[in-house]
Structures are given as structure tokens and as C-alpha cells.
């Protein structure tokens, strides 16, 4: 059956959006789905299970279902006015609307392990899981910390990533997307983009303001060729632009705990050259790393300039350090770097 798509006339009557924004224009969604070409990954969409976090007004949910007819489509929405809206619009539809909190970790253990309402298939990590997709809208203020937690789960292979390499389609403020996709040596480079680069292949798919593209790497924009749409296509229309990114987990071969320790401490002092900052990893660190790093150009770099491979190289040296500190005794706030420099 085809699910009716909520229109802007009904959407605009809602009083509470809780600081989030939603694309409502079906024409723009068609352009986005054409660009994503999801059937390359999900060759048998009728076997696909989709978990939709913070679906809001459900326009994307309805369009996705009508286009791909997945086996199961579950919407996780606890916010009162939006939950009522979804129930009113999709009461007789195949969409499964669950009044649970996407922010609460216990939601997922309850959903998957206890109630077994939504049970994805575990697949090997040599490919993107072709029977499980996650989509989410975190366009509200303060979403960056939640995205960082999800990225950390990719590295630790827990949460939804215990089921393999699960693709995520993620709406966020364009300012967050710029920070997430920042390249080495750019002003927006932070621990957030370092983690993203280490654990995922992430692309900008769409954005609601062409002027925002100036904040991204020009070569990447040329490669990604994102869909550009208008602020008039989102509701509420006021406020910051939003962006959609596609996030695919990738293979990595390094010790995550030691890598996290090294990157976290170095990015706190991200504009200080390595030849003076290495004591931040532990007493005597500067002398040790100065003696081990043979590339004199690397030792002159600041953490903000380092590539993923260079961070991995420094982690390897750190693990070989006979007097390295006990990283389990480290209590540095993992988000401190996001608000520094």
C-alpha cells in the first residue's frame, strides 16, 4: 500500500518542533534518493529493516517506505506533539511508531534484546549490512555530543554497530556537518572530524543553503556534488541551514583505546607543534617522541594538521613507549577538545 505523505499545510499547524527542522518537500526527497542510489547497497529492499530516530513529521519515512517497501520500518519518537502527529497520519499504515527515546541507551536493549520488536540481522564486516539501515534527524541544538557518541560506537563496534557495518543517513545543522567533515589544517578541524575520518567514509549528500558550501573543502564538494535546496523546503524555515550526510563504517586496524587517548590529548592543544606538545601524553613524552619520529617535517606539524595515517603512526609509537602512562587512569573530558581552540 502507498502511504499518504504529510503536507506542509498540516505540518505548519504544529506548534512544537523542539528545536529540530525537517525537510518536507517530496520533490527534493526524490532528488536525494536518486543521488543516494540505495539499491546499490540494498539490492533486495523488501528484506531491509529501517530504524528511524527522531522522525519528526514523518515525510521522509513515508517517502522512503513508498519507494523501497522495506520489510520493517520503525519510527522512534517520544516527543509528545510529534508522536501524536505521526499516530494520526500513519495509524493504518505499515509504519511502526514506537514511543521511545532515541537518546536513551536502554531504548535499544529493550527494543532489540528484551521486547525483540526490532531485531536486525548480524552480518560480517566485509561489506555494508544490506538488511539494516539507520536514519536519524539531529538538527536540534546540542546534537554534536550525540553524534560523537554514535561515532565512538562505530569504533567500539557496539550499540547498533554490533550488527556489522550499518549505514546511517543523518540530518544535522550545517555548522555541525562542516565540523564533522573538516579536513586537516582547516579551521573547523577538531576531534569530531578526526574520529569521523578514522572510522567512517562520510559524504555530504544535501544542504539547504548554497552559501554554506564555502565552509567545506572545495575538492570534496566537487566530488560529492550535493543536492542544494531552499530554506523554504524545510519547516520551521527560520534558523540555521541543515545538511544530510551519508555515513558508512570502514575497516580500521589500530588499538582504539590507545588511539583515543593520543588523539584526545593532542587535539586539546591542536595548534601547538608536535615538537613541544608531546608531554601532554605523559611525563617524558617529548623526549621519547622526538627521538622516535624520524620525519622532521612531521615533528613540526600541529595536531590540527595531522592526517588519519599520522595519528595512527603516533599511536603505534605511543604503544611502544616503555614508560607510557596507564590510559585507564585518564579522566580528561572526551568533549573538552570540541570546545577548545
Curated annotation (Swiss-Prot):
Keywords: DNA-binding, Methyltransferase, Mitochondrion, RNA-binding, S-adenosyl-L-methionine, Transcription, Transcription regulation, Transferase. GO terms for cellular component: mitochondrial DNA-directed RNA polymerase complex; mitochondrial matrix. It is an enzyme of class 2 (transferase). GO terms for biological process: methylation; transcription initiation at mitochondrial promoter. Its main location: mitochondrion. It is found in: Mitochondrion. It comes from the Eukaryota. Its EC number is 2.1.1.-. Mitochondrial transcription factor that confers selective promoter recognition on the core subunit of the yeast mitochondrial RNA polymerase. Interacts with DNA in a non-specific manner. Belongs to the class I-like SAM-binding methyltransferase superfamily. rRNA adenine N(6)-methyltransferase family. This is Mitochondrial transcription factor 1. The lineage of its organism: Eukaryota, Fungi, Dikarya, Ascomycota, Saccharomycotina.
Amino acid at each position: 500500500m502507498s502511504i499518504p505523505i504529510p503536507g506542509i499545510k498540516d505540518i505548519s499547524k504544529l506548534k512544537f518542533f523542539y528545536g529540530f527542522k525537517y525537510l518536507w518537500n517530496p520533490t527534493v526527497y526524490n532528488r536525494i534518493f536518486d543521488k543516494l542510489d540505495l539499491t546499490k547497497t540494498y539490492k533486495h529492499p523488501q528484506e531491509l529493516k529501517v530504524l528511524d530516530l527522531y522522525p519528526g513529521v514523518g515525510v521522509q519515512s513515508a517517502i522512503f517506505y513508498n519507494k523501497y517497501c522495506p520489510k520493517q520500518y520503525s519510527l522512534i519518537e517520544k516527543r509528545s506533539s510529534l508522536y501524536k502527529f505521526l499516530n494520526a497520519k500513519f495509524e493504518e499504515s505499515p509504519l511502526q511508531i514506537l514511543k521511545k527515546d532515541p537518546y536513551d541507551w536502554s531504548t535499544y536493549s529493550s527494543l532489540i534484546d528484551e521486547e525483540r520488536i526490532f531485531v536486525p540481522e548480524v552480518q560480517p564486516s566485509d561489506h555494508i549490512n544490506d538488511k539494516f539501515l539507520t536514519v536519524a534527524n539531529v538538527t536540534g541544538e546540542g546534537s554534536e555530543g550525540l553524534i560523537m557518541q554514535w561515532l565512538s560506537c562505530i569504533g567500539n563496534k557496539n550499540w547498533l554497530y554490533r550488527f556489522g557495518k550499518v549505514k546511517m543517513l543523518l540530518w544535522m545543522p550545517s555548522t555541525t556537518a562542516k565540523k564533522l567533515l573538516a579536513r586537516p589544517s582547516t579551521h573547523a578541524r577538531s576531534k569530531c572530524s578526526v574520529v569521523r575520518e578514522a572510522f567512517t567514509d562520510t559524504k555530504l549528500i544535501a544542504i539547504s543553503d548554497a552559501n554554506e558550501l564555502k565552509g567545506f573543502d572545495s575538492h570534496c564538494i566537487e566530488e560529492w556534488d550535493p543536492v542544494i535546496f531552499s530554506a523554504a523546503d524545510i519547516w520551521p524555515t527560520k534558523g540555521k541551514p541543515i545538511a544530510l550526510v551519508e555515513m558508512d563504517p570502514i575497516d580500521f586496524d589500530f588499538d582504539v583505546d590507545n588511539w583515543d587517548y593520543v588523539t584526545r590529548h593532542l587535539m586539546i592543544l591542536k595548534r601547538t607543534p608536535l615538537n613541544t606538545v608531546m608531554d601532554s601524553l605523559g611525563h617524558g613524552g617529548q623526549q621519547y617522541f622526538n627521538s622516535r619520529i624520524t620525519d622532521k617535517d612531521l615533528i613540526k606539524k600541529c595536531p590540527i594538521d595531522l592526517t588519519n595515517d599520522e595519528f595512527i603512526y603516533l599511536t603505534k609509537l605511543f604503544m611502544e613507549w616503555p614508560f607510557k602512562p596507564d590510559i585507564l587512569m585518564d579522566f580528561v573530558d572526551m568533549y573538552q577538545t570540541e570546545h577548545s581552540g
